């Protein structure tokens, strides 16, 4: 007997306004209320608040809702300091006092890692920096408005591909922030606006760095606009690059950028990864060294080493450091950085850290200690191989507590115990949190 496809009936979404009591916050900073034991996630709502909501999504196990009105605001609620707060997708916790943000993130981390904590696990004090003006890096999106034919200049709106026009960002370092209105005005003088891709801003010790990504070669009549941009860079003591292709940078004005970290100098290209928050990064590196306790006669392995942000400061402690990174260009830069700082007790290798490493020459050696600093996806490809490397101590620096928790299970199975755990607030006023965990072989 033939069966005919019958589409499932769509659940009728209840769109009328409802009042609810917010009981807690989730790890992403959304308020959680309950209706018939089903959680309702409400962006912008705080625990203890009575709010009016409108459902925007209803699933079998949860719902999402839009905050319509505050009936009873929390005493922890503050007026956001940025006029773009409700539109820009960058910050989403400015309505919560900063100390409460730090407390919430710390609690979220310990909750996610509770399975691996013992009575002996030490929870370190959170590492924090400045509440505003902390970002030393930003990518400015560019888009031509079809109606006005003017360049839209700013950041993506919340849950949208549209751009919120911004010429003043409170979390951007003031030395970069001051460039925004000047750049927007100048870029609008280009005749071929649709050929402009984005602007990358980075701050090094040598000053601001500006990168203009253009999708097509600039036409001849835009040469004058480019010359004006070069003049602006000189006036601001900035370095200016053009980026005609994804992997090609052309330095037009200024010196090659670098930053200093715990006594070492790290030159970098503006397309290289560096931590956004310099003050938190400095404390993070210092804490990693303190937890690792590198000794002069030990071998330390730094996985996902990048430019040498951890490797070179550790090498200054006289330990022999082997850094491994997936991107060959970064390996070359780390090697050059070690030579610049006269650190001969280092070696750097390129390797795919998602594959079996037993065939790698460097992996055939034993290591006393290991540091991992993976991307958000975590270190699932290599974490199962840590014990085979012989490490007694492992410091795991994570930008995603969910993958840290997942990888902790593997380390626990290999005989490591969670000795220390700490939260690092690299991105104030967002729900993103960095963390550091120390595992010691039992």
UniProtKB/Swiss-Prot annotation:
SUPFAM superfamilies: Nucleic acid-binding proteins, S-adenosyl-L-methionine-dependent methyltransferases. PANTHER family: 23S RRNA (URACIL(1939)-C(5))-METHYLTRANSFERASE RLMD (PTHR11061:SF49), RNA M5U METHYLTRANSFERASE (PTHR11061). This is 23S rRNA (uracil(1939)-C(5))-methyltransferase RlmD. InterPro entries: 23S_rRNA_MeTrfase_RlmD, MeTrfase_TrmA_AS, MeTrfase_TrmA_CS, NA-bd_OB-fold, SAM-dependent_MTases_sf, TRAM_dom, U5_MeTrfase_fam. Gene3D superfamilies: 2.40.50.1070, Nucleic acid-binding proteins, Vaccinia Virus protein VP39. The active site is at 399 (nucleophile). GO terms for molecular function: 4 iron, 4 sulfur cluster binding; iron ion binding; RNA binding; rRNA (uridine-C5-)-methyltransferase activity. Residues 10-69 form the TRAM domain. Catalyzes the formation of 5-methyl-uridine at position 1939 (m5U1939) in 23S rRNA. Belongs to the class I-like SAM-binding methyltransferase superfamily. RNA M5U methyltransferase family. RlmD subfamily. It comes from Vibrio atlanticus (strain LGP32) (Vibrio splendidus (strain Mel32)). It catalyses: uridine(1939) in 23S rRNA + S-adenosyl-L-methionine = 5-methyluridine(1939) in 23S rRNA + S-adenosyl-L-homocysteine + H(+). Keywords: 4Fe-4S, Iron, Iron-sulfur, Metal-binding, Methyltransferase, rRNA processing, S-adenosyl-L-methionine, Transferase. [4Fe-4S] cluster binds at residues 82, 88, 91, 169. S-adenosyl-L-methionine binds at residues 275, 304, 309, 325, 352, 373. Its EC number is 2.1.1.190. It comes from the Bacteria. The keyword Manganese does not apply. The keyword Cytoplasm does not apply. GO terms for biological process: rRNA base methylation.
């Amino acid at each position: 007997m033939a069966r005919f496809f019958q589409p499932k009936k769509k659940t009728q979404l209840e769109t009328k306004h409802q009042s609810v009591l917010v009981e807690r916050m989730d790890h992403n900073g959304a308020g959680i209320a309950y209706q018939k034991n089903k959680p309702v996630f409400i962006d912008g709502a705080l625990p203890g608040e009575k709010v009016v909501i409108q459902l925007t999504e209803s699933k079998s196990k949860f719902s999402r809702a839009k905050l319509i009105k505050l009936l009873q605001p929390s005493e922890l609620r503050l007026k956001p300091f940025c006029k773009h707060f409700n539109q820009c997708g960058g910050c989403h916790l400015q309505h919560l006092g900063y100390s409460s943000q730090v407390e919430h993130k710390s609690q979220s981390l310990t909750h996610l890692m509770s399975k691996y904590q013992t009575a002996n696990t030490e929870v370190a004090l959170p590492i924090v920096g400045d509440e505003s003006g902390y970002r030393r890096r930003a990518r400015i999106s560019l888009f031509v408005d079809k109606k006005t034919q003017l360049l839209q200049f700013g950041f993506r709106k919340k849950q949208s591909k549209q751009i919120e026009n911004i010429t003043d960002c409170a979390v951007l370092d003031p030395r970069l922030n001051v460039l925004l209105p000047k750049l927007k005005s100048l870029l609008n003088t280009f005749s071929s606006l649709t050929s402009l891709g984005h602007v990358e801003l980075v701050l090094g010790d040598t000053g601001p760095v500006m990168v203009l990504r253009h999708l097509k070669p600039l036409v001849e009549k835009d040469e004058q606009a480019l010359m004006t941009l070069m003049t602006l860079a000189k006036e601001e003591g900035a370095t200016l690059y053009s980026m005609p292709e994804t992997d090609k940078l052309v330095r037009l004005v200024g010196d090659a950028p670098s930053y200093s970290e715990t006594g070492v100098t790290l030159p970098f290209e503006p397309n290289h990864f560096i931590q956004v928050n310099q003050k938190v990064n400095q404390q993070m590196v210092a804490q990693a060294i303190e937890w690792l306790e590198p000794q002069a006669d030990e071998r330390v392995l730094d996985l996902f080493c990048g430019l040498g942000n951890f490797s070179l400061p550790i090498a200054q402690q006289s330990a022999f450091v082997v850094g491994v990174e997936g991107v060959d260009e970064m390996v070359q830069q780390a090697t050059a950085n070690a030579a610049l700082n006269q650190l001969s007790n280092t070696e750097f290798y390129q390797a795919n850290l998602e594959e079996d490493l037993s065939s790698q020459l460097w992996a055939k050696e034993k290591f006393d200690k290991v540091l991992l600093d993976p991307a958000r996806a975590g270190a699932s490809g290599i974490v199962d191989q840590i014990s085979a490397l012989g490490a007694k101590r492992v410091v795991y620096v994570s930008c995603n507590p969910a993958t840290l928790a997942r990888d902790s299970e593997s380390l626990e199975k290999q005989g490591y115990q969670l000795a220390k755990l700490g939260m690092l607030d690299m991105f104030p006023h967002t729900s993103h949190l960095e963390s550091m965990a120390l595992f010691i072989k039992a």
